[in-house]
Amino acid sequence: MIEITFREFFEYKYHEDGFHELYVMKNGLDEILYIGISSENIWNRWFGSRGHIMVGMNYLIGESSVGRKVVDHLPDSWDWKIQLWTLDDCMTFCAGELNPNGRYTIKWLEPFMIQKLRPSLNVIYNLNPGIDNTPLSEREKKRMAALDKAYREIFEKNSKWKK
């Protein structure tokens, strides 16, 4: 397993000793935000077609819950950590839950990793998610205010949408 800053990951400034198939994204408080897998290349899972973050000429757009969280917290999130795990790393970490004679794939191990590490943004397999204590960014505050306003307009008593 290697742990690098998100900037190092984005700029592809790291050396991979093996084929990494699972990633763990942490916030600036060292809390685990998200766990995901890739059958090809983790960098492409983040920044390629249908990735977590869309990369433009002079902008980044979050396309998933974890991508939005990272982009909303730039520039601070450049220093957040991402861990890259190999299949063997995951098997060692989950050894207590596995049959030592079993044959495992990363798709089979991902639920165990999510259940053990309890990331705050994963929904599937996450029966007891952790808490994200990252302070709200200005972008998040503006988005929440706009959503609250839309909710009030639609559902409150004097809404133009009610008959």
Question: Model segments located where?
Answer:
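Boundary/linker segments flanking structured domains
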Residues: 1-21, 26-33, 38-163
